[in-house]
Amino acid sequence: MTGSLGMGMGQDEPVDGIERDAMEFDVVVVGAGPAGLATAIRLKQLAAERSQDISVCVIEKGAEVGAHILSGAVIDPGALDELLPGWKENDPPAMTAATTDEVLFLSAAHQLKVPAWATPPAMQNHGNYIVSLAQLTRWLGGQAEALGVEIYPGFPAARVLYTAEGQVRGVVTGDMGLDRDGQPTDAFQPGMELLGRYTVFAEGSRGHLGRAL
């Protein structure tokens, strides 16, 4: 298997020339943030609607889902309403409804409140919710697992795998047990090849694999 695959450059590159275990999935999602988890959830929903069974794997570099998510956010619940109808009855994380907005124009010595009619729509939050995005992401992870999605936290993706024809075939997770020079120690554990018919990169805007593609 490894002989027919190439590797794209990435961060914390795995040691070359060693045999690695491999797992096959229909879809491999890199990144267990809101986008990656929503993708996994929707794919499983669509498969169920067609009476199909697909395997979906999500890998996350953080020690747990939500560990690398900014702590706070104001969210528009419309996406949750579409993705998970009835989500409010499914034990979501604590949320506070946004009831008022204040936009202030600040000078060196004064502040001026911008009237509601002059506030840009993107800055109006009536009907939205204030929530810990880390908690929301962990909750989404639970919803995904309930649908049969396999989530592997603590497994950073280190490289992209390509076929001989240059198609993305999956990713290699980072090796563990390396010294400061990147050489294997006695505790060395090679990363795994996670192979998918489709690979979704949901690392965020600073994802190193996305920059390498």
What are these regions (language model features)?
Residues 27, 55-63, 196-201:
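Extended hydrophobic secondary-structure segments that form protein cores and membrane-embedded regions
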Residues 32-33, 133:
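Glycine-rich Rossmann-fold phosphate-binding loop(s) that bind the pyrophosphate
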Residues 36:
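N-terminal Rossmann-fold NAD(P) dinucleotide-binding loop
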Residues 52, 134, 138-139, 143-213:
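Predominantly flavin-linked oxidoreductase catalytic cores and closely associated redox partners
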Residues 53-110:
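N-terminal FAD cofactor-binding segment of flavoenzymes
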Residues 65, 93, 97-110, 127-130, ...:
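Rossmann-like flavin
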Residues 112-133, 142, 170:
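Helix-loop-beta segment of a Rossmann-like dinucleotide-binding subdomain
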